A protein has these predicted regions:
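Asp-based, Mg2+/Mn2+-dependent phosphohydrolase catalytic module
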Residues: 2, 107, 123-233
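N-terminal helical cap/lid subdomain that shapes the substrate entry/recognition surface
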Residues: 2-9, 13-100, 107, 111-112
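Conserved phosphate-coupling serine/threonine residues in phosphotransfer and NTP-handling enzymes
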Residues: 12, 120-122
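Residue-level detector of family-conserved "landmark" positions at structurally sensitive sites
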Residues: 38-40, 69, 119, 174, ...
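Residues at secondary-structure transition points
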Residues: 70, 74, 78, 93-100, ...
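Short beta-strand-loop/turn "lid" adjacent to the catalytic site in phosphate-handling enzymes
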Residues: 115
């Protein structure tokens, strides 16, 4: 009988959103842009998932000045690539760590025979950097679905549906771990029972569709999480 836990990354495995915000600002500065995303603005921008999509949203909805004439899509791709380099440099420099309880959950779940997977909108490079620094690599995770591996990012269910396909499991045999409403809507739309551990940018969001909301994962024995999965035949 096979069961799996599917993890989001940013805000779930680690409070990385603040590091992402600073990496965006570093990329903007390197590009000679006067843009600066403070915490209040970034919280608003997090309504959109995906870094390139977030930059596009900022340009279109916040009247961002300084966009060069020509191919805006190419400009956004270049800017996002610079941001990814800045982010991975920060992570490699030890500026992030796992959220309390995550390391213990991964270890305990593995000891109980759970399969582990990742479903995230962040880039594979970002996932590799984070897991390399915090866990010594990606070996704990059998399946990693990241970045542009699907056409539609969260809150669409695509990335979770891809993870289920690669795991060859029904949604009922899995539980998802998320930190945001967009992530919750994505996993629930894929039919997966979902545990939410709110992060610094997502506390106060509506998590009414969650099977379980846990403010302090480190204070749990994880049995309530495991109980949400139905063993597959």
């Amino acid at each position: 009988m096979s069961r799996a836990i599917i993890f989001d990354v940013d805000g779930t495995l680690s409070e990385t959103e603040e590091t992402h915000r600073r990496a965006f600002n570093r990329a903007f500065e390197q590009a000679g842009l006067a843009w600066r995303w403070d915490q209040a603005l970034y919280e608003r921008l997090l309504a959109v998932t995906g870094g390139k999509e977030r930059i596009r949203y900022f340009i279109d909805d916040f009247d961002a000045a300084g966009v060069p004439p020509g191919d805006v899509d190419a400009f956004i791709r270049s800017l996002h690539a610079a941001k990814t380099i800045a982010y991975t440099d920060m992570v490699s420099g030890g500026e992030v760590e796992l959220r309390p309880g995550i390391r213990e959950l991964i270890s305990d779940a593995q000891s109980r025979g759970f399969r582990l997977a990742i479903a995230t909108t962040t880039t594979p490079a970002n996932v590799d950097a984070l897991l390399g620094v915090t866990l010594g690599g990606c070996d704990a995770f059998e399946v990693i679905c990241a970045g542009d591996s699907v056409a539609h990012k969260k809150p669409a269910p695509d990335v979770y549906e891809l993870a289920l396909e690669k795991l060859q499991l029904d949604a009922a045999a899995c539980v998802a771990l998320e930190d945001s409403r967009n992530g919750l809507l994505s996993s629930v739309a894929a039919g997966i029972p979902t545990v939410v551990t709110p992060g610094i940018y997502t506390r106060g969001q509506d998590f009414s569709e969650a099977a379980l909301v846990i403010d302090d994962l480190a204070a749990q024995d994880f049995s309530a999480i495991y109980a949400l999965t139905a063993p597959a035949a």
